[in-house]
Amino acid sequence: MKKQERQRYIKRLLSSNEIERQEDFVKLLRAEDIDVTQATISRDIKDMQLVKVPSATGGYHYSMPVQKQMDTEKKLKRTLKDAYVSYATQDKFVLIKVLPGNGPALATLIEAMHYDEIFGTLGDDAHVLIICKSLAMTLELQQKIQRLLSDH
């Protein structure tokens, strides 16, 4: 597996798990049939600039650097401000319409935010389809989108 693909898996794992040790990364990745060593994970952690932050249980877990998350949110707000046309929801789906050429970038930025509500995103030239994990989470995501749109 290529480094970029493995690091995408690591980001996904971070968004849904509190990972305290490098061995936990190895175990979770192997459960996905991705064969890695602790040394590889160590290099990925350094390369991705992961940090350890306090967890609710009293220990520490790995996280993306806060600055990167803030930069991503700024880019997301700016892209929405520049390209947003409209959005609609139905059941577990949110469809955001944007100016042509902006769909893939917006989908990538939304994925990079690692929102808990999102199961997956699809972006074409002028749309982003977001699939949420539940109806309740669709409403939560809708509120986040409203906040992002009203902040500019």
Curated annotation (Swiss-Prot):
Pathway involvement?
Amino-acid biosynthesis; L-arginine biosynthesis [regulation]
Q: What is its main location?
A: cytoplasm
The cellular location(s) given in this protein's UniProt record come to:
Cytoplasm
Which keywords are on file for this protein? Answer: Amino-acid biosynthesis, Arginine biosynthesis, Cytoplasm, DNA-binding, Repressor, Transcription, Transcription regulation
Record carries keyword Transport: no
Q: Name one GO cellular component term.
A: cytoplasm
Q: List, in alphabetical order, the Gene Ontology terms for molecular function in this entry.
A: arginine binding; DNA binding; DNA-binding transcription factor activity
The record's annotation in Gene3D superfamilies points to: 3.30.1360.40, Winged helix-like DNA-binding domain superfamily/Winged helix DNA-binding domain
Under the heading InterPro entries, the entry gives: Arg_repress (IPR001669), Arg_repress_C (IPR020899), Arg_repress_C_sf (IPR036251), Arg_repress_DNA-bd (IPR020900), WH-like_DNA-bd_sf (IPR036388), WH_DNA-bd_sf (IPR036390)
The GO annotation for biological process reads: L-arginine biosynthetic process; protein complex oligomerization; regulation of arginine biosynthetic process
Pfam families reported in the protein's UniProt record:
Arg_repressor (PF01316), Arg_repressor_C (PF02863)
Is Glycoprotein tagged as a keyword? no
Similarity comment: family membership = Belongs to the ArgR family.
Q: What does this protein do?
A: Regulates arginine biosynthesis genes.
Q: What is this protein called?
A: Arginine repressor
**Source species taxonomy:** Bacteria, Bacillati, Bacillota, Bacilli, Lactobacillales
